[in-house]
Regions:
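Residue-level recognition of tetratricopeptide repeat
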Residues: 24, 65, 97-99, 138, ...
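Long, ordered, amphipathic alpha-helical scaffolds
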Residues: 398-483
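Helix-turn-helix repeat elements of alpha-solenoid scaffolds
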Residues: 27-41, 65-79, 101-115, 139-158, ...
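Solenoid-like repeat scaffolds
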Residues: 8-11, 42-51, 81-89, 115-124, ...
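Long, contiguous interaction/recruitment modules in multidomain scaffold/adaptor proteins
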Residues: 2-10, 162, 166-167, 176-290, ...
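Alpha-helical adaptor scaffolds
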Residues: 325-326, 330-339, 349-389
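Generic helix N-cap/helix-start motif at coil->alpha-helix transitions
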Residues: 12-21, 51-61, 86-95, 122-136, ...
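N-terminus-biased targeting/localization segments
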Residues: 2-152, 161-172, 176-193
Length: 483
Protein backbone atom coordinates (compact mmCIF):
# COMPACT_ATOMS: atom_id res chain seq x y z
CA UNK A 1 0.00 0.00 0.00
CA UNK A 2 1.36 3.41 -0.98
CA UNK A 3 1.46 6.12 1.63
CA UNK A 4 -0.13 9.44 0.78
CA UNK A 5 2.36 12.19 -0.02
CA UNK A 6 1.40 13.99 3.18
CA UNK A 7 2.61 11.01 5.23
CA UNK A 8 5.70 10.15 3.15
CA UNK A 9 7.54 13.34 4.10
CA UNK A 10 7.35 12.89 7.89
CA UNK A 11 8.22 9.20 7.55
CA UNK A 12 11.28 10.00 5.46
CA UNK A 13 12.39 12.61 8.00
CA UNK A 14 11.92 10.09 10.81
CA UNK A 15 14.05 7.53 8.96
CA UNK A 16 16.74 10.12 8.28
CA UNK A 17 16.80 11.17 11.93
CA UNK A 18 17.22 7.54 12.95
CA UNK A 19 20.13 7.17 10.51
CA UNK A 20 21.77 10.33 11.85
CA UNK A 21 21.50 8.98 15.40
CA UNK A 22 23.12 5.72 14.28
CA UNK A 23 26.01 7.77 12.87
CA UNK A 24 26.32 9.64 16.17
CA UNK A 25 26.30 6.38 18.15
CA UNK A 26 28.96 4.88 15.87
CA UNK A 27 31.20 7.91 16.37
CA UNK A 28 30.78 7.71 20.14
CA UNK A 29 31.84 4.05 19.89
CA UNK A 30 35.00 5.05 17.95
CA UNK A 31 33.70 3.13 14.92
CA UNK A 32 34.73 5.44 12.08
CA UNK A 33 34.25 2.68 9.51
CA UNK A 34 30.55 2.57 10.39
CA UNK A 35 30.32 6.37 10.46
CA UNK A 36 31.65 6.51 6.90
CA UNK A 37 29.54 3.57 5.69
CA UNK A 38 26.35 5.16 6.98
CA UNK A 39 27.22 8.82 6.54
CA UNK A 40 29.10 9.24 3.27
CA UNK A 41 26.18 8.20 1.02
CA UNK A 42 24.04 10.89 2.65
CA UNK A 43 26.74 13.57 2.73
CA UNK A 44 27.77 12.97 -0.89
CA UNK A 45 24.20 12.89 -2.22
CA UNK A 46 23.51 15.68 -4.71
CA UNK A 47 20.37 16.67 -2.79
CA UNK A 48 21.64 18.27 0.43
CA UNK A 49 18.24 19.04 1.94
CA UNK A 50 18.54 16.18 4.43
CA UNK A 51 21.58 17.88 5.92
CA UNK A 52 19.77 21.09 6.80
CA UNK A 53 18.75 19.97 10.29
CA UNK A 54 20.99 20.07 13.35
CA UNK A 55 21.27 16.28 13.20
CA UNK A 56 22.22 16.47 9.52
CA UNK A 57 24.90 19.09 10.11
CA UNK A 58 26.23 17.00 13.00
CA UNK A 59 26.45 13.97 10.67
CA UNK A 60 28.56 15.97 8.21
CA UNK A 61 30.91 16.98 11.01
CA UNK A 62 31.37 13.37 12.13
CA UNK A 63 31.96 12.14 8.58
CA UNK A 64 34.60 14.84 8.09
CA UNK A 65 36.32 13.91 11.35
CA UNK A 66 36.44 10.24 10.36
CA UNK A 67 37.64 11.01 6.84
CA UNK A 68 40.43 13.08 8.34
CA UNK A 69 41.63 10.45 10.81
CA UNK A 70 41.42 7.74 8.14
CA UNK A 71 43.76 9.73 5.89
CA UNK A 72 41.21 10.85 3.31
CA UNK A 73 42.09 14.50 3.92
CA UNK A 74 41.20 15.69 0.42
CA UNK A 75 37.65 14.38 0.69
CA UNK A 76 37.45 15.60 4.27
CA UNK A 77 38.26 19.11 3.10
CA UNK A 78 35.67 18.99 0.30
CA UNK A 79 33.03 17.85 2.77
CA UNK A 80 34.11 20.38 5.41
CA UNK A 81 33.71 23.25 2.94
CA UNK A 82 30.26 21.97 1.99
CA UNK A 83 29.27 21.32 5.61
CA UNK A 84 30.38 24.71 6.87
CA UNK A 85 27.94 26.32 4.42
CA UNK A 86 25.04 24.70 6.27
CA UNK A 87 23.01 26.92 8.58
CA UNK A 88 23.49 24.54 11.53
CA UNK A 89 27.20 23.90 11.03
CA UNK A 90 29.21 23.86 14.26
CA UNK A 91 32.25 25.89 15.24
CA UNK A 92 34.09 22.56 15.49
CA UNK A 93 33.53 21.87 11.79
CA UNK A 94 34.91 25.29 10.87
CA UNK A 95 37.97 24.55 13.00
CA UNK A 96 38.51 21.22 11.24
CA UNK A 97 38.17 22.92 7.86
CA UNK A 98 40.82 25.47 8.82
CA UNK A 99 43.11 22.78 10.27
CA UNK A 100 42.90 20.70 7.08
CA UNK A 101 43.88 23.76 5.05
CA UNK A 102 46.71 24.57 7.43
CA UNK A 103 48.09 21.03 7.41
CA UNK A 104 47.65 20.78 3.65
CA UNK A 105 49.54 24.05 3.06
CA UNK A 106 46.43 25.47 1.38
CA UNK A 107 47.29 29.01 2.42
CA UNK A 108 44.87 30.85 0.16
CA UNK A 109 42.01 28.56 1.19
CA UNK A 110 42.87 29.08 4.87
CA UNK A 111 42.71 32.85 4.48
CA UNK A 112 39.39 32.47 2.65
CA UNK A 113 38.09 30.42 5.57
CA UNK A 114 39.14 33.13 8.03
CA UNK A 115 37.32 35.64 5.85
CA UNK A 116 34.12 33.58 5.77
CA UNK A 117 34.21 33.10 9.54
CA UNK A 118 34.55 36.85 10.01
CA UNK A 119 31.28 37.31 8.10
CA UNK A 120 28.76 35.96 10.57
CA UNK A 121 30.67 33.15 12.28
CA UNK A 122 32.62 35.17 14.81
CA UNK A 123 32.45 32.50 17.52
CA UNK A 124 34.09 30.01 15.16
CA UNK A 125 36.83 32.49 14.28
CA UNK A 126 37.46 33.33 17.93
CA UNK A 127 37.75 29.62 18.77
CA UNK A 128 40.61 28.95 16.33
CA UNK A 129 43.71 28.25 18.48
CA UNK A 130 46.22 31.09 18.28
CA UNK A 131 49.01 28.61 17.53
CA UNK A 132 47.17 27.61 14.32
CA UNK A 133 46.74 31.23 13.30
CA UNK A 134 50.40 31.88 14.09
CA UNK A 135 51.46 28.90 11.97
CA UNK A 136 49.45 30.20 9.01
CA UNK A 137 50.98 33.66 9.33
CA UNK A 138 54.49 32.17 9.50
CA UNK A 139 53.80 30.08 6.40
CA UNK A 140 52.61 33.17 4.55
CA UNK A 141 55.66 35.13 5.68
CA UNK A 142 58.12 32.38 4.79
CA UNK A 143 56.49 31.95 1.37
CA UNK A 144 56.55 35.73 0.79
CA UNK A 145 52.78 35.88 0.36
CA UNK A 146 52.49 39.37 1.78
CA UNK A 147 49.16 40.18 0.12
CA UNK A 148 47.51 37.12 1.68
CA UNK A 149 49.19 37.81 5.01
CA UNK A 150 47.91 41.37 4.97
CA UNK A 151 44.36 40.15 4.21
CA UNK A 152 44.53 37.79 7.17
CA UNK A 153 45.98 40.40 9.51
CA UNK A 154 43.30 42.95 8.63
CA UNK A 155 40.71 40.43 9.83
CA UNK A 156 42.71 39.55 12.93
CA UNK A 157 43.12 43.18 13.98
CA UNK A 158 39.44 44.07 13.67
CA UNK A 159 37.43 44.94 16.77
CA UNK A 160 35.23 41.89 16.13
CA UNK A 161 38.11 39.43 16.58
CA UNK A 162 38.51 38.53 20.25
CA UNK A 163 40.34 35.18 20.46
CA UNK A 164 39.12 32.90 23.21
CA UNK A 165 42.71 32.38 24.38
CA UNK A 166 43.38 36.09 24.96
CA UNK A 167 41.64 38.74 27.01
CA UNK A 168 40.99 41.53 24.54
CA UNK A 169 42.66 42.10 21.15
CA UNK A 170 45.91 40.35 20.34
CA UNK A 171 48.67 42.93 19.91
CA UNK A 172 51.04 40.67 17.99
CA UNK A 173 48.82 40.87 14.92
CA UNK A 174 48.76 44.67 15.11
CA UNK A 175 52.55 44.73 15.14
CA UNK A 176 52.80 42.49 12.08
CA UNK A 177 50.24 44.51 10.14
CA UNK A 178 51.95 47.77 11.11
CA UNK A 179 55.21 46.44 9.66
CA UNK A 180 53.49 45.51 6.41
CA UNK A 181 51.73 48.88 6.16
CA UNK A 182 55.02 50.68 6.81
CA UNK A 183 56.79 48.63 4.14
CA UNK A 184 53.93 49.39 1.77
CA UNK A 185 54.36 53.13 2.21
CA UNK A 186 51.43 53.74 4.56
CA UNK A 187 53.03 55.09 7.77
CA UNK A 188 49.86 56.84 8.95
CA UNK A 189 47.93 53.55 8.94
CA UNK A 190 50.83 51.89 10.76
CA UNK A 191 50.90 54.70 13.34
CA UNK A 192 47.18 54.22 13.98
CA UNK A 193 47.69 50.49 14.58
CA UNK A 194 50.60 51.14 16.94
CA UNK A 195 48.57 53.70 18.90
CA UNK A 196 46.19 50.87 19.84
CA UNK A 197 48.90 48.69 21.39
CA UNK A 198 48.22 47.98 25.06
CA UNK A 199 50.59 45.18 26.09
CA UNK A 200 54.02 46.21 27.42
CA UNK A 201 55.88 43.57 25.41
CA UNK A 202 54.27 44.73 22.16
CA UNK A 203 55.14 48.36 22.93
CA UNK A 204 58.71 47.32 23.72
CA UNK A 205 58.93 45.33 20.48
CA UNK A 206 57.76 48.32 18.45
CA UNK A 207 60.32 50.58 20.15
CA UNK A 208 63.13 48.16 19.29
CA UNK A 209 62.09 47.74 15.65
CA UNK A 210 63.92 50.32 13.47
CA UNK A 211 60.99 50.23 11.04
CA UNK A 212 58.47 51.22 13.70
CA UNK A 213 60.50 53.24 16.19
CA UNK A 214 59.90 56.61 14.45
CA UNK A 215 56.15 55.98 14.73
CA UNK A 216 56.24 55.36 18.49
CA UNK A 217 56.69 58.98 19.60
CA UNK A 218 54.36 59.61 22.53
CA UNK A 219 53.73 55.93 23.29
CA UNK A 220 53.44 55.11 27.00
CA UNK A 221 56.37 53.76 28.98
CA UNK A 222 56.21 49.96 29.33
CA UNK A 223 55.75 50.17 33.08
CA UNK A 224 52.92 52.68 32.70
CA UNK A 225 51.32 50.37 30.14
CA UNK A 226 51.64 47.46 32.57
CA UNK A 227 49.95 49.43 35.35
CA UNK A 228 47.15 50.39 32.95
CA UNK A 229 46.71 46.75 31.95
CA UNK A 230 46.61 45.71 35.59
CA UNK A 231 43.81 48.19 36.25
CA UNK A 232 41.89 46.82 33.26
CA UNK A 233 42.32 43.22 34.37
CA UNK A 234 41.32 43.98 37.97
CA UNK A 235 38.14 45.57 36.66
CA UNK A 236 37.46 42.49 34.54
CA UNK A 237 38.01 40.23 37.57
CA UNK A 238 35.42 42.23 39.48
CA UNK A 239 32.93 42.27 36.61
CA UNK A 240 33.40 38.61 35.60
CA UNK A 241 34.09 36.55 38.74
CA UNK A 242 33.16 33.40 36.82
CA UNK A 243 36.18 33.73 34.50
CA UNK A 244 39.81 32.75 35.09
CA UNK A 245 41.20 34.63 32.10
CA UNK A 246 41.56 38.13 33.53
CA UNK A 247 42.83 36.79 36.85
CA UNK A 248 45.60 34.83 35.13
CA UNK A 249 46.61 37.79 33.00
CA UNK A 250 46.55 40.18 35.96
CA UNK A 251 48.93 37.81 37.73
CA UNK A 252 51.29 37.85 34.75
CA UNK A 253 51.35 41.65 34.84
CA UNK A 254 52.03 41.68 38.59
CA UNK A 255 54.98 39.38 37.97
CA UNK A 256 56.21 41.66 35.18
CA UNK A 257 56.05 44.56 37.64
CA UNK A 258 58.26 42.64 40.09
CA UNK A 259 55.42 41.73 42.45
CA UNK A 260 55.28 37.91 42.26
CA UNK A 261 53.98 37.42 45.79
CA UNK A 262 50.95 39.55 44.93
CA UNK A 263 50.51 37.40 41.83
CA UNK A 264 50.59 34.26 43.97
CA UNK A 265 48.09 35.73 46.43
CA UNK A 266 45.73 36.64 43.58
CA UNK A 267 45.95 33.18 42.02
CA UNK A 268 45.55 31.46 45.37
CA UNK A 269 42.42 33.50 46.07
CA UNK A 270 40.54 31.03 43.84
CA UNK A 271 42.59 27.91 44.64
CA UNK A 272 39.65 26.30 46.44
CA UNK A 273 37.48 26.75 43.33
CA UNK A 274 39.67 25.61 40.43
CA UNK A 275 38.88 21.93 41.01
CA UNK A 276 35.17 22.68 40.66
CA UNK A 277 34.29 22.14 37.00
CA UNK A 278 31.35 24.55 37.31
CA UNK A 279 33.14 27.45 39.03
CA UNK A 280 34.53 29.13 35.90
CA UNK A 281 33.03 29.25 32.42
CA UNK A 282 36.50 29.24 30.85
CA UNK A 283 38.00 26.61 33.15
CA UNK A 284 38.70 24.07 30.39
CA UNK A 285 40.83 26.50 28.39
CA UNK A 286 42.38 28.49 31.24
CA UNK A 287 43.11 26.06 34.09
CA UNK A 288 46.40 25.04 32.51
CA UNK A 289 47.39 28.75 32.32
CA UNK A 290 46.41 29.27 35.97
CA UNK A 291 48.91 26.57 36.99
CA UNK A 292 51.52 27.93 34.58
CA UNK A 293 51.29 31.42 36.02
CA UNK A 294 51.44 30.08 39.58
CA UNK A 295 54.60 28.15 38.68
CA UNK A 296 56.24 31.18 37.07
CA UNK A 297 55.43 33.31 40.11
CA UNK A 298 57.01 30.79 42.50
CA UNK A 299 59.99 30.56 40.15
CA UNK A 300 60.40 34.36 40.41
CA UNK A 301 60.87 33.89 44.16
CA UNK A 302 63.29 30.94 43.70
CA UNK A 303 60.76 28.63 45.36
CA UNK A 304 61.71 25.58 43.34
CA UNK A 305 59.55 22.90 44.98
CA UNK A 306 56.36 24.94 44.75
CA UNK A 307 57.10 25.93 41.15
CA UNK A 308 57.79 22.33 40.15
CA UNK A 309 54.62 21.14 41.86
CA UNK A 310 52.56 23.75 40.01
CA UNK A 311 54.06 22.75 36.64
CA UNK A 312 53.27 19.09 37.36
CA UNK A 313 49.69 19.99 38.23
CA UNK A 314 49.38 22.04 35.06
CA UNK A 315 50.76 19.17 32.99
CA UNK A 316 48.21 16.82 34.54
CA UNK A 317 45.38 19.02 33.26
CA UNK A 318 46.25 17.36 29.98
CA UNK A 319 46.31 18.02 26.28
CA UNK A 320 44.43 15.64 23.97
CA UNK A 321 44.61 12.89 26.59
CA UNK A 322 48.33 13.27 27.32
CA UNK A 323 50.43 15.35 29.69
CA UNK A 324 50.56 18.96 28.58
CA UNK A 325 53.52 19.36 26.21
CA UNK A 326 54.60 22.89 27.14
CA UNK A 327 54.19 22.40 30.89
CA UNK A 328 56.48 19.37 30.87
CA UNK A 329 59.15 21.31 28.97
CA UNK A 330 58.72 24.26 31.35
CA UNK A 331 59.24 21.86 34.26
CA UNK A 332 62.43 20.49 32.67
CA UNK A 333 63.73 24.01 32.07
CA UNK A 334 63.04 24.85 35.71
CA UNK A 335 64.96 21.78 36.81
CA UNK A 336 67.93 22.76 34.65
CA UNK A 337 67.86 26.32 36.01
CA UNK A 338 68.02 25.02 39.58
CA UNK A 339 70.86 22.57 38.89
CA UNK A 340 68.82 19.37 38.49
CA UNK A 341 69.65 18.23 34.92
CA UNK A 342 69.18 14.52 35.69
CA UNK A 343 65.65 15.23 36.89
CA UNK A 344 65.08 17.29 33.74
CA UNK A 345 66.05 14.37 31.51
CA UNK A 346 63.77 12.11 33.52
CA UNK A 347 60.93 14.61 33.07
CA UNK A 348 61.50 14.66 29.31
CA UNK A 349 61.28 10.86 29.01
CA UNK A 350 57.52 11.37 28.88
CA UNK A 351 58.06 12.30 25.23
CA UNK A 352 59.94 9.11 24.34
CA UNK A 353 56.77 7.19 23.50
CA UNK A 354 54.53 10.02 22.38
CA UNK A 355 51.53 8.95 20.32
CA UNK A 356 51.30 12.54 19.14
CA UNK A 357 53.76 15.04 17.78
CA UNK A 358 54.31 18.54 19.05
CA UNK A 359 54.32 21.61 16.87
CA UNK A 360 57.58 22.34 15.02
CA UNK A 361 58.26 25.07 17.57
CA UNK A 362 57.41 22.78 20.49
CA UNK A 363 59.78 20.11 19.21
CA UNK A 364 62.56 22.68 19.04
CA UNK A 365 61.92 23.59 22.67
CA UNK A 366 62.04 19.90 23.58
CA UNK A 367 65.41 19.37 21.87
CA UNK A 368 66.76 22.61 23.32
CA UNK A 369 65.78 21.63 26.85
CA UNK A 370 67.21 18.15 26.45
CA UNK A 371 70.41 19.57 24.98
CA UNK A 372 70.88 22.00 27.87
CA UNK A 373 70.42 19.14 30.34
CA UNK A 374 73.07 17.09 28.54
CA UNK A 375 75.38 20.13 28.53
CA UNK A 376 74.96 20.54 32.30
CA UNK A 377 75.96 16.90 32.76
CA UNK A 378 78.95 17.18 30.44
CA UNK A 379 77.50 14.62 28.02
CA UNK A 380 78.94 16.20 24.89
CA UNK A 381 78.05 13.38 22.49
CA UNK A 382 74.37 13.54 23.43
CA UNK A 383 74.47 17.34 23.31
CA UNK A 384 75.88 17.19 19.77
CA UNK A 385 72.86 15.15 18.60
CA UNK A 386 70.47 17.79 19.95
CA UNK A 387 72.55 20.58 18.37
CA UNK A 388 72.38 18.78 15.01
CA UNK A 389 68.57 18.56 15.21
CA UNK A 390 68.18 22.21 16.15
CA UNK A 391 70.48 23.45 13.40
CA UNK A 392 68.65 21.31 10.84
CA UNK A 393 65.32 22.86 11.88
CA UNK A 394 66.54 26.40 12.57
CA UNK A 395 63.64 28.09 10.78
CA UNK A 396 61.18 26.62 13.30
CA UNK A 397 62.77 28.53 16.22
CA UNK A 398 65.95 30.48 15.36
CA UNK A 399 66.47 31.53 19.00
CA UNK A 400 66.89 27.86 19.96
CA UNK A 401 70.16 27.80 18.00
CA UNK A 402 71.43 30.63 20.20
CA UNK A 403 70.13 29.06 23.39
CA UNK A 404 71.69 25.63 22.94
CA UNK A 405 75.03 27.23 22.02
CA UNK A 406 74.89 29.28 25.23
CA UNK A 407 74.02 26.18 27.25
CA UNK A 408 76.92 24.30 25.70
CA UNK A 409 79.44 27.08 26.26
CA UNK A 410 80.03 27.45 22.51
CA UNK A 411 80.89 31.15 22.26
CA UNK A 412 81.51 31.09 18.51
CA UNK A 413 78.23 29.39 17.65
CA UNK A 414 76.25 31.62 20.03
CA UNK A 415 77.80 34.78 18.58
CA UNK A 416 77.22 33.61 15.00
CA UNK A 417 73.57 32.84 15.75
CA UNK A 418 72.98 36.20 17.44
CA UNK A 419 74.63 38.11 14.60
CA UNK A 420 72.53 36.22 12.04
CA UNK A 421 69.29 36.96 13.92
CA UNK A 422 70.18 40.62 14.38
CA UNK A 423 70.70 40.97 10.62
CA UNK A 424 67.32 39.40 9.80
CA UNK A 425 64.43 41.93 9.90
CA UNK A 426 62.01 39.20 11.02
CA UNK A 427 64.28 37.96 13.84
CA UNK A 428 65.92 41.22 14.89
CA UNK A 429 63.37 42.37 17.45
CA UNK A 430 63.31 39.04 19.28
CA UNK A 431 67.09 39.12 19.55
CA UNK A 432 67.12 42.73 20.77
CA UNK A 433 64.46 41.93 23.38
CA UNK A 434 66.63 39.09 24.69
CA UNK A 435 69.69 41.35 24.78
CA UNK A 436 68.03 44.37 26.40
CA UNK A 437 68.26 45.29 30.09
CA UNK A 438 65.34 44.95 32.47
CA UNK A 439 64.44 45.82 36.04
CA UNK A 440 66.16 43.72 38.68
CA UNK A 441 64.13 40.68 39.76
CA UNK A 442 62.88 40.60 43.38
CA UNK A 443 65.13 37.60 44.07
CA UNK A 444 68.39 36.95 42.24
CA UNK A 445 68.33 33.87 40.03
CA UNK A 446 70.88 31.07 40.60
CA UNK A 447 73.98 31.35 38.37
CA UNK A 448 74.13 29.06 35.32
CA UNK A 449 76.63 28.05 32.64
CA UNK A 450 74.20 29.61 30.16
CA UNK A 451 74.51 32.96 31.93
CA UNK A 452 78.30 32.81 32.03
CA UNK A 453 78.51 32.16 28.29
CA UNK A 454 76.01 34.93 27.62
CA UNK A 455 78.10 37.50 29.51
CA UNK A 456 81.16 36.61 27.43
CA UNK A 457 79.32 36.62 24.11
CA UNK A 458 77.61 40.01 24.50
CA UNK A 459 80.99 41.63 25.18
CA UNK A 460 82.45 40.47 21.86
CA UNK A 461 83.21 43.25 19.40
CA UNK A 462 81.40 41.53 16.53
CA UNK A 463 78.25 41.05 18.60
CA UNK A 464 78.33 44.65 19.85
CA UNK A 465 78.67 45.87 16.25
CA UNK A 466 75.72 43.73 15.16
CA UNK A 467 73.59 45.08 18.02
CA UNK A 468 74.42 48.67 17.05
CA UNK A 469 73.68 47.99 13.37
CA UNK A 470 70.30 46.50 14.33
CA UNK A 471 69.30 49.67 16.16
CA UNK A 472 70.55 48.99 19.67
CA UNK A 473 68.97 47.71 22.85
CA UNK A 474 67.06 49.54 25.59
CA UNK A 475 66.52 49.33 29.31
CA UNK A 476 62.94 48.57 30.29
CA UNK A 477 61.49 49.35 33.72
CA UNK A 478 59.75 45.98 33.93
CA UNK A 479 61.02 42.44 34.40
CA UNK A 480 62.04 40.46 31.34
CA UNK A 481 59.02 39.41 29.31
CA UNK A 482 57.92 35.75 29.75
CA UNK A 483 60.64 35.16 32.34
Amino acid sequence: MCLPASAAGPLREKQQSAKFRQIDDAYDADDCAKVLRLGQPIVHRADKRALGSKLGARAVELVVQCERVSGATGQAHVDAVMGSSLKNSSDALWRVRFLLELQGKMDEAAVATLTEMSQGRGSALNSIPLRWVGELLRNLRDNHQDALRERALILLTSDQYLPDEAYGPFDGFRLDLARLRTAGGHPDEARSLLADLVSPDAIASARLDPRLRPLMVGAPDERVAAEQQLTQFRRAIRDHPDQLSALVQASAVLRMLGRPQEAIDLLQSVADQVDDSTAFVDRDSKLNWWWDELARSYKSLNQYEKAASAYRSGAAVGENGALNFSQMINLADLQILFGRPKEALQTLTVFDDLNRSGSPYGLMMLHSSRGCAFASLGEREQLAKEVDYIRAHEKDAPAAVTDIALCGGDDEAAAASLIKRLADPDQRVGALLALSDYADPPVKRPPTAYGSTYLRVVERADVKAAIAAAGGTRRFAVLEFDS
